[in-house]
Each structure stands twice: as C-alpha cells, then as structure tokens.
C-alpha cells in the first residue's frame, strides 16, 4: 500500500495519534513560525495550519505548511473554499503535494463579515464537499475536473470536520462524505465522555468506523471565563458545568485545565473508534506539547 503521508501510515498501522494546531503568524519571517511551533516538533504526529481563521489575514496557510514540511514536520493544510475559486484550489493541491504537503483538511472557512475586513467578498465558487470530491478525483483518477491528465498525480490524505456535540450523528451524511473521498475526520471540541461514547457507538453500528479515522477535538482553557466564552460563542461546543466549577475552584486554573485535558484523553482513547486526539487552542502550542508528552508516557 502506498501511504499518502506519515499521518496516513501511522493511522493505518494503528498508532494512536496526536495532532495539534497553529495559526500562521502576522509576519513574513519564517523563523517566527518555526519558533512558534518549536515545542510541538517531534511531539505532535502532525500539525494543522489554519487558513486565516476568524476571517483575519495571516501568513498564507499553504506557505506555512510548506515551511513545516521543509523542517521535517508533517503538516495538515487547512484549505478553505472561502477565498479561492476552483482553479486556485486545484493549483494549490498540486503545488502542496509537490512540496511535501500531503494532508489536507477541507473546510468552508469563516464568513468574512466576522473578520477585520468585513467588506471582503468571498469566492463562493465551490463548497467544501466539492473540494473533497475534486481532491479525490485528482489523486485517484489522476486528472483535473476538466479531464486533463496530471502526471504525476498529487499524493493527498483528505480530511473533513465533524461536530459530535450537536446530537446524534447523521450517518448517511458521514458515509456520503467518506464515499466522496474523505479519509479522516477531525472534530470540534468534545468535553463530555458519555456523549462521545454514544456518538461513536452510532458510528460503529453504521459501519463507519471501519472505513475512516476519527481524531477527537480537545484543548486547554485559559480560565473558567474562557470556558464559558467557548460555550456561548463556538458552534457545537458544550463545556459541562462540572468542568467550569472545577476550574473556578482551582488555585491555578491553567494548570487545572491541563489536568482536565489529560484525564479526558485517557478516557477518550479507550472509546471504540477513537484513533487519536486533535488538540487546539489559540497561542497554546507549548501547553499542548506538554499535554501530548504527558499523555504519550502514561
């Protein structure tokens, strides 16, 4: 079997993986990026590179992903359809693969109206579902949608997003995404083990877990206040009251938050079908690296 990326091989081999996330800097200096993710190198199995999250401009996600690949880090390029038409997206897929970026996460992207340049007009050419199908066609059929051949075709390991906390999963929709070309899923934050277990059982009963890999989203809080903010402002995020109270009563809320993450990881990894953890958090690369290290030796 030809593996599309190191992450692909690890998941195929049954390794429980840890992925992390970074937002490219507001800088044209690549050393700024490398310094930011230094603690994650050799710790995370792969690092997501976000694509102007919150519709605020940062260094190009593709450029940042290439820099990581050139420094022996397996990147996951978050590719949004918000800013590019189909021609630009297809060109980026070929270019990314040519320079060692093989994991991609296909997303819609945040609405420009929520960013700091709200007058921006989104591309609105294709949606993320079409992007997945396009990427799959390019790697499998070795051709562009126009029919022109690609030689050699790009090596791509295609990911999508899911939100376990929003209720019972739509298994038909998820199966459709897999048929469309998705190889793995990274989820929104999950902080309730029981809900996750129920969610994964539904997926297992539908035969989904044998077809794909689920990496469950998790991350540390800066404080109880930030946990409440996530509850109120992030779609599909539900932080239980007991976790918020635990943080409020802690002498060191940041340290307590790390403990919460570590404990949830130990529970999540025992749930059937969970193949890894995707750790997120704004400017929390060092904290996330500590959580991964502790989890790997436990």
Question: Which role does the model predict for each range below?
Answer:
Residues 1-23, 27, 35, 143-155:
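N-terminal amphipathic alpha-helix/helix-capping segment at the start of soluble metabolic enzymes
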Residues 5-8, 29-31, 55-67, 85-91, ...:
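Active-site-adjacent beta->alpha loops and helix N-cap segments on the catalytic face
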Residues 17-31, 75-87, 155-169, 247-259:
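Active-site mouth loops of central-metabolism enzymes
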Residues 21, 47, 96, 177, ...:
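Conserved, mostly hydrophobic/aromatic
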Residues 27-40, 60-61, 86-93, 166-178, ...:
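Short, acidic/polar
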Residues 43-83:
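Active-site cofactor/substrate anionic-group-binding motifs, chiefly glycine-
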Residues 47-57, 79-80, 106, 183-193, ...:
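Catalytic beta/alpha-barrel core
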Residues 122-151, 161-166, 206-264, 283, ...:
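Active-site pocket-lining/capping segments in soluble small-molecule metabolic enzymes
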């Amino acid at each position: 079997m030809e593996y599309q990326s190191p992450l692909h091989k690890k998941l195929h081999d049954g390794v429980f993986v840890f992925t992390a996330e970074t937002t490219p800097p507001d800088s044209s200096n690549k050393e700024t990026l490398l310094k930011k993710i230094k603690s994650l190198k050799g710790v995370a199995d792969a690092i997501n590179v976000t694509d102007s999250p919150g519709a605020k401009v940062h260094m190009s996600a593709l450029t940042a992903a290439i820099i990581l690949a050139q420094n022996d880090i397996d990147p996951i390029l978050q590719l949004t359809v918000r800013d590019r038409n189909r021609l630009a997206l297809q060109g980026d897929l070929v270019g990314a693969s040519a320079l060692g970026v093989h994991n991609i996460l296909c997303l819609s992207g945040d609405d420009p109206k929520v960013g700091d340049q709200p007058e921006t007009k989104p591309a609105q050419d294709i949606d993320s579902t079409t992007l997945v199908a396009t990427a799959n066609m390019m790697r499998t059929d070795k051709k562009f949608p126009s029919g022109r051949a690609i030689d050699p075709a790009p090596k791509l390991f295609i990911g999508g997003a899911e939100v376990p906390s929003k209720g019972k999963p739509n298994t038909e929709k998820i199966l459709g995404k897999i048929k469309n070309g998705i190889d793995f899923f990274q989820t929104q934050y999950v902080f309730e083990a029981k809900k996750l277990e129920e969610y994964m059982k539904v997926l297992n009963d539908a035969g989904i877990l044998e077809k794909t890999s689920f990496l469950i989203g998790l991350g540390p809080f800066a404080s109880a206040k930030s946990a409440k903010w996530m509850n109120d402002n992030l779609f599909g995020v539900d932080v239980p009251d007991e976790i918020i109270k635990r943080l409020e009563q802690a002498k060191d809320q940041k340290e307590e938050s790390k403990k919460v993450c570590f404990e949830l990881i130990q529970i999540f990894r025992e749930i059937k079908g969970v193949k890894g953890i995707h750790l997120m958090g704004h400017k929390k690369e060092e904290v996330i690296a500590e959580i991964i290290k502790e989890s790997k030796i436990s």
